[in-house]
Amino acid sequence: MHNVTSRWPHQNSIKIEWNLGKRCNHDCSYCPSSIHDSTSPHTNIEILKATVDKLMTLGKPVRLSFTGGEPTVHPKFKELVQYCKHVGISWISVTTNGTLPYEFYASLPVDQYVFSIHLEYDWKRVFNTVESIVDLTKIKVIAQIMAHHDRMDAVLQLRAKCLLAEIPSTVRRIRWTEGDHDLFDDMRYKLNDLEWIKEQDATVQGNCVIDGEQVIHANDVIKLHLNKFKDWSCNAGIESLMINWDGDVHRATCRVGGSLGNIYEGTYVVPSSPVICDRNFCTCAADIPISKHVLSESLSD
């Protein structure tokens, strides 16, 4: 394997992963308190709108992916999304736990929802909402099934429901982020459960191309341990940026290359060249499709 890129012509645009805040109405066992809580203040809507204005000066089409925390708990979230559409953001995705009513999701002018379905909560109600979005709107939907090792019966049920309803889905192994950020703790799974998870190909359209030939979804790249790009040249910062809940900006969700400054404070600098990956594994599906390749000197070794 020598190069990976997006299946779609996104190389001349920029995708922004924007963590709107740490606030979340869930408290999942595998999500550490350092990245979610129920008390952090919401960022002022005028700061958020000013940030959108700054993104629109990047000189290329902007694709926004809102995450959190839980982005929809921000009291001005709908206003923010409407503003993004008004100023010309080209594509908007929202990653959500799906706990709000169908009417809320259907009312937002977004292009895609990624429903992260957590089996520790009322997943059947969330599935019903997802199914309604698919049946009654034209919004693209992806169901991420968070495969908790103690909830495998529910995981199997939910996967079967998604397949039956033809809802695009991925089965995600849990990464217990309080510990090693590179690895998934497969030892928590029973062997037969782990094998089943690894057999579940994403039914979402493949979004990556490997070596110009193999089309594959980013989640499957991670599942098959093809996500080893250390010492590769990566366009993180060219094709992507990540905004943290406090306005700190990085090249991508992996935070390779360190902080670029703070966009809320007007101090960030946009990179003009690729970065050499220094991570053992690329563990976030959002970062996998970013164009990356083996350096020529590595090919000759």
Give the role of each language-model region.
Residues 7-47:
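Canonical Radical SAM [4Fe-4S] cluster-binding loop centered on the CxxxCxxC motif
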Residues 39, 73-75, 102-103, 151-153, ...:
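Short catalytic/ligand-binding loop motif for oxyanion handling, primarily in non-cytosolic enzymes
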Residues 48-66, 74-161, 168:
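Radical SAM/AdoMet-radical enzyme domain recognition
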